[in-house]
Design a protein with these regions (language model features):
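A residue-level marker of the well-folded mature domains of exported/periplasmic proteins
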Residues: 1-226
Length: 226
C-alpha cells in the first residue's frame, strides 16, 4: 500500500486483528500494522552531484507531488548534492499536489524549462518529466533528467542521466522471512543502498547513462564529505 492508503491500512488492521499488514512509505503503526520504505536520499544526493556538474544555466528544477517528509527529504538531499558540485546553482520546486497525474507533471516540467531550468528531477509516479526533457533535447535544447523509482531511461535515452531505482523484492523477501521465523515486528523498516533496495540509475545495471559519463568526468569535486 502506498502513502495515500495509510489510514485505510490501519483501519484494516483493526478490522482483522489476526492478520499482519505492511504499509509502504507511511508512518503509522499498530500491533499488526508495520511500515517499510526504500530511503532514497543517498541516490538523490548522487543525482544532485550530477545535476550540479552538468547544468549550464545554474537553474535546477524539481517536480514534487506533495510537501510530505518523504518528498522534502528527497529535495533536500538532491539540493545538497547540487551544492557540492555547483554552489552557484539554485533548485526550484513546482508542486503538483498529486502522486499520479501525467498532465500536471508535464505542465510543471514545461513551466520549469520555460523559466530557464536545464535539469529536472521529481518525486511523483509518472515518466512525464523525463519525456519532457527528452522532447526538448530532441528539439535541440539539452535538458537533463533523472528518473524516479522505476526504470525510465528508455523514455529519455538522450536526456536521462541517472535516477533512483527500488528493488522491492529485497524488502518483501526479508519481510516474509521475518514472518516465517516469528521475528516480525511493526518497527519501521528503512532500506538504504547498503541493503540493495535503493539503487542508482535510470535503468537497472546502468548507474549512469553512458552518454553523460565523459562530461561528468570533467568535473572535479573537492569537498570534505567526498
Amino acid at each position: 500500500c502506498s502513502y495515500g492508503f495509510m489510514d485505510d491500512t490501519v483501519k484494516a488492521g483493526e478490522k482483522y486483528p489476526n492478520k499482519l499488514f505492511m504499509h509502504c512509505s507511511g508512518y503509522k503503526q499498530s500491533a499488526n500494522v508495520g511500515t517499510y520504505f526504500a530511503d532514497l536520499y543517498q541516490m538523490y544526493y548522487l543525482n544532485g552531484l550530477m545535476a550540479g556538474a552538468l547544468t549550464k544555466s545554474n537553474r535546477i528544477g524539481y517536480v514534487g507531488a506533495f510537501p510530505t517528509p518523504e518528498v522534502v527529504r528527497h529535495i533536500d538531499a538532491y539540493a545538497l548534492g547540487v551544492m557540492a558540485t555547483n554552489p552557484k546553482a539554485k533548485v526550484e520546486v513546482r508542486w503538483i499536489y498529486s502522486w499520479f497525474d501525467p498532465q500536471k507533471a508535464k505542465e510543471a516540467a514545461e513551466a520549469l524549462v520555460a523559466a530557464g531550468v536545464d535539469c529536472l528531477a521529481f518525486t511523483e509516479d509518472t515518466q512525464s518529466v523525463v519525456q519532457v526533457a527528452e522532447e526538448h533535447t530532441a528539439a535541440g535544447k539539452q535538458i537533463y533528467s533523472f528518473s524516479h523509482y522505476s526504470a525510465m531511461q528508455k523514455y529519455g535515452e538522450n536526456s536521462c542521466v541517472s535516477g533512483q531505482l527500488v528493488d522491492w523484492g529485497v524488502m518483501y523477501v526479508k519481510i516474509f522471512e521475518d514472518i516465517k521465523a516469528g521475528k516480525w515486528t511493526n518497527a519501521d523498516m528503512w532500506w538504504l543502498s547498503g541493503d540493495k533496495a535503493a539503487v542508482l540509475g535510470g535503468e537497472f545495471g546502468v548507474p549512469i547513462n553512458p552518454k553523460f559519463v565523459d562530461a561528468l568526468k570533467t568535473k572535479v569535486v573537492l569537498t570534505a564529505d567526498l
